[in-house]
Structures are given as structure tokens and as C-alpha cells.
Amino acid sequence: MTATLERRESASLWERFCTWITSTENRLYIGWFGVLMIPTLLTATSVFIIAFVAAPPVDIDGIREPVAGSLLYGNNIISGAIIPSSAAIGIHFYPIWEAASLDEWLYNGGPYQLIVLHFLLGVSCYIGREWELSYRLGMRPWISVAFTAPVAAAAAVFLVYPIGQGSFSDGMPLGISGTFNFMLVFQAEHNILMHPFHQLGVAGVFGGSLFSAMHGSLVTSSLIRETTENESANNGYKFGQEEETYNIVAAHGYFGRLIFQYASFNNSRSLHFFLGLWPVVGIWFTAMSVSTMAFNLNGFNFNQSVVDSQGRVINTWADILNRANLGMEVMHERNAHNFPLDLASSNSLPVSLVAPSVNG
């Protein structure tokens, strides 16, 4: 009797790497999108921390008046920010090797572009990674679709808006007070509060918060008890169990009596589809509002739209908002010679009819 033994060739290093990358047994799934996501997000995070702590002032307006944003230059957690790239750079791609020196790159706000572009690439890969893991587990792809909403919003304020305005200096600063400054200036220049897409976005965010609170409270109030009265209801459930953990019929009946019958869902799939759809569509509209206003397709202007029989203006909320916008825009302009267009375009008013005499 003859036994034949065949020696099985060991898998190549590349094949083992591919198997490990795409394995769903890893504690954290990596995936092919993760191969790009991990280094880009690590780069963005590392540069952000270093720049937030120690970056020198940046000439954001391109007028040789640098603005300090880091902690070592006198800021705190609230006032600190990564200052956007200089207006002198515009929307040019500005990597380190395009500058004459590292000092010049820092002075012109190079870290902002580095952080933003790596961040956007990283979170885009995170979308792909969500889809990839869902695909390998046999799940449907809607998790990745939902995550496109915040990514679209980030791309709108960090990339689309600077492109539309012609300079990365118009992008949103990476900091708390910088975000608020961006919001105020955006309102002053584009009247975002009167843009219908932004209004839909507000409805999406606040409505999503309301629906989330309603759903969570209804579920936790209608749990199916699997334990005795002397034991916590939480002990009656196992992670991944097939049985329902709450009684949707009871929740539906409660809410139907609280509001009216057709205000509640009696189908779990349609309920959760609605809970996912509402905020996602709202944030999509918010991203579209910023993207359209990037090219100066601004909010509605109803200024001085109500007049009396004598032609005198009756101020409405739109006029009050317009006055606030003008005030914010004036405060924003750091150049005395660079007035906002809507202030500089009207006829000049004489403030002195006689030149003052200067003695001595």
C-alpha cells in the first residue's frame, strides 16, 4: 500500500494580507476602504492636534495681519481654532512642497488645507467601509447611505463653499468660536435663515431629535417583561435575541390615544425607515443650501416689501433681519477700505459740507 502525501503550498503574504483585511472576524473591520481611511484620518487628527496647540498666526485675509488660533498664542479651548488658508492662496492646492519654506506654509495657513482634505477623504472612505462591511455580512446598504448626509454637510462647508467663493479663507475655521463666526458671517452675506433648503434642514434636525426621543421613550416604556417583579427587566434580554424586546402594539395604542390614531406606526419597518429618512433628508437639504449659496444663490429677500398707502415702508421681520445682517457684515470686515457691497453701492451721504480748518 502506497500513500501519497502532497505538500500544500502556504498562501503568499499578499493573500494572507487580503484575507486579514477583508475578514469580518476582526474586532474592528478594516476593509479595503479602511486601508485608505486609517492613514488619512490619522494624518488629519495628528495635524489638527499639533496645529491647535502650537500653530503660528495665519494671514487669513492676505493683508499681512496674521490671526492667531492656537493655544500657545493666547487662545483657550473655546476661542482656539485652525485658521483657514490665506486669501492670497485662494483655492490653489497648497501642499508643503509648494511653499518656499515651512514658515511660509504655516504663515499662509497650509495646515488647514492638509487637515480638511485628508478629513474629507477619510470620512468618504468611512462611507465605503460601512457599505463594504454591510455587503460582507449580507446586510442592506442603508447605513452607508445615511452617513452620506453628514459627509455632504462637511464637504459643503469645507470644500464646496470655498470653491464657490474663490478662496479657502472663506471656509469654516476648525474650532468652536470659529464655527460660530462662520455661521454669523454666512447669515450676513447669504441670508441663510431665509433659504428654504436650510429651513428644511432645521426641520430635519429638530424633527429627528423629537422623533428619536419619542421612539426611545415609547420603546423603554413598553418592554416585554421576561423577569419577575423582584428582578430588573434588563436581565431578561440577550444581545442578538430573535424575540421582540418591546410590544409595538402597546406603544402604537398608547401614542394613538395620546395624539390620534394615524399619528403612530403599527409597522416596525416603516417606523424605523421614517426615523432614518427624516433627519438624513433634512441634512441633505442643509448641505444643498450651503452648496447653492456658495455660488451666491442666496436666501429670499423680502426687504421693504410692505408699504402703506403713502409709500412709507412698514418694517417686517425681514427688514429687522436685514439690519442685523448689515451689522454683522460690517463687524466682520477687518479692512476699513473694504466695505460690504450692499453698503458701498448706495449713494453717498454728505457728512460735512465745509472742510474743517486745520491750524498750525
Swiss-Prot record:
CDD domains: Photosystem-II_D1. GO terms for molecular function: chlorophyll binding; electron transporter, transferring electrons within the cyclic electron transport pathway of photosynthesis activity; iron ion binding; oxidoreductase activity, acting on diphenols and related substances as donors, oxygen as acceptor. Gene3D superfamilies: Photosystem II protein D1-like. It is a multi-pass membrane protein. Residues 345-360 form a propeptide. The record marks 190 as: Stabilizes free radical intermediate. Fe cation binds at residues 215, 272. Chlorophyll a ChlzD1 binds at residue 118. It catalyses: 2 a plastoquinone + 4 hnu + 2 H2O = 2 a plastoquinol + O2. The D1/D2 heterodimer binds P680, chlorophylls that are the primary electron donor of PSII, and subsequent electron acceptors. It shares a non-heme iron and each subunit binds pheophytin, quinone, additional chlorophylls, carotenoids and lipids. D1 provides most of the ligands for the Mn4-Ca-O5 cluster of the oxygen-evolving complex (OEC). There is also a Cl(-1) ion associated with D1 and D2, which is required for oxygen evolution. The PSII complex binds additional chlorophylls, carotenoids and specific lipids. It comes from the Eukaryota. Its main location: plastid. The record marks 344-345 as: Cleavage. It is found in: Plastid, Chloroplast thylakoid membrane. Pheophytin a binds at residue 126. Keywords: Calcium, Chlorophyll, Chloroplast, Chromophore, Electron transport, Herbicide resistance, Iron, Magnesium, Manganese, Membrane, Metal-binding, Oxidoreductase, Photosynthesis, Photosystem II, Plastid, Thylakoid, Transmembrane, Transmembrane helix, Transport. Pfam families: Photo_RC (PF00124). [CaMn4O5] cluster binds at residues 170, 189, 332-333, 342, 344. Its EC number is 1.10.3.9. Photosystem II (PSII) is a light-driven water:plastoquinone oxidoreductase that uses light energy to abstract electrons from H(2)O, generating O(2) and a proton gradient subsequently used for ATP formation. It consists of a core antenna complex that captures photons, and an electron transfer chain that converts photonic excitation into a charge separation. The D1/D2 (PsbA/PsbD) reaction center heterodimer binds P680, the primary electron donor of PSII as well as several subsequent electron acceptors. PSII is composed of 1 copy each of membrane proteins PsbA, PsbB, PsbC, PsbD, PsbE, PsbF, PsbH, PsbI, PsbJ, PsbK, PsbL, PsbM, PsbT, PsbX, PsbY, PsbZ, Psb30/Ycf12, at least 3 peripheral proteins of the oxygen-evolving complex and a large number of cofactors. It forms dimeric complexes. Belongs to the reaction center PufL/M/PsbA/D family. HAMAP family: PSII_PsbA_D1. 2 of the reaction center chlorophylls (ChlD1 and ChlD2) are entirely coordinated by water. Herbicides such as atrazine, BNT, diuron or ioxynil bind in the Q(B) binding site and block subsequent electron transfer. This is Photosystem II protein D1.
